[in-house]
Amino acid sequence: MSTKRRYEMKILGIVAGRHGGNSEILVKEALVAAAAKGVECKMINLFDYHIEHCTGCESCTMQMGEVAMDPTKKYKGCILKDKDDMDKIVNEMQTCNGVIVGVPTYDLTPSSLYLKFAQRFLAYELSFRMEIGDVTEDPHTVAGLIAVGGSCHDWQTLTLEGMGATMFTQSITVVDQMMATRNGRPGNVLLRPEQLERAHKMGENVVEAVNTPVEERHWMGDPDQGLCPNCHSGLIFRGEPHWDGLQYPFECAVCGAGGDLVKGEDGQVKFILAPNGLARDRNINESRALHLKEIVSTRIDFMKRQGEIQDLKKHYKEITFPAI
């Protein structure tokens, strides 16, 4: 089904926390700021929708690979789309110019409700849907991300990064993000006016980004946030060879930027991008297309060699243990 943008500017708030909770309050404050600038705003709380877990069936990636090799074939989308609300939500989201997402932190990471939602995004990969005509107009969506937790950054180390990692399959550019700390009870954030002000500013930043020509858009959050100069993630890991041999000394775990860690004269460690450091930037559609080639290549190799493992597959299938 084709989707078309119907409004001059539209921002969708997405909440993965309880009704009346801190995540919802902060998203509402950001939307208030956007609405004050004449933007149409909508908000959903994921607790109000039925969302099935991704089953790992690979139907979407199998279809994508087949369509990539034979454009005459039709992409039917996620096999769960008639069983829950995911199709409705994503089709609406892919008409929005901006999204503001509020998620509580559980065990250092985004809540399972948000991840259940976001890990269904692959079947709706925006650049692929545009290529085959399912989506007729690129909304060039920008995002503001809000992580909320009862403690400081040391107990929310993976939340913003985990949220950021879910944006690229929708070709969404994150222009701002904030971490709301020490909010242990519903409504706690109302005692922290500086966090409400920051959420308000995020709403204004998202509107400003939407009004900025796509090629001129830039990071509008804290310039010193994170180590990665590309996506402002704080997660940098020692690089290892990619499937095609590319390797960097260090990489950003979120966007895939490559470079090296360098200590400056001020004693501060910085992540300096390599000359080709954005060659695998996951925010770039062409870079993700390379990943699709990797998936297709891996699948072709498996299909050629699957006869070698039939006895082993049977062996492991026949092994059983008592369940609980």
Q: Model regions: which residues?
A:
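Short boundary motifs at domain starts and secondary-structure transition points
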Residues: M1-R5, D134-E137
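N-terminal beta1-alpha1-beta2 submodule of the flavodoxin-like/Rossmannoid cofactor-binding fold
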Residues: S2-G102, L108-A123, E197, M202, ...
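A generic secondary-structure micro-motif detector
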Residues: G20, I79, H153, M178-A180
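Short beta-strand elements in bilobed, periplasmic/extracellular small-molecule ligand-binding domains
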Residues: E40-M43, I172-A180
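Flexible, glycine/proline-enriched loop segments at strand-loop-helix junctions
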Residues: P104-D107, V148-D154, V189-L191
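Short, glycine-/small-residue-rich phosphate/pyrophosphate-handling segment
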Residues: S111-L113, F128-Q177
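Short, well-ordered alpha-helical segments in soluble proteins
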Residues: A118-F121, E125-R129, A147-G150, M167-V174, ...
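A short acidic, helix-capping loop that chelates divalent metal ions and anchors anionic groups
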Residues: N183-G187
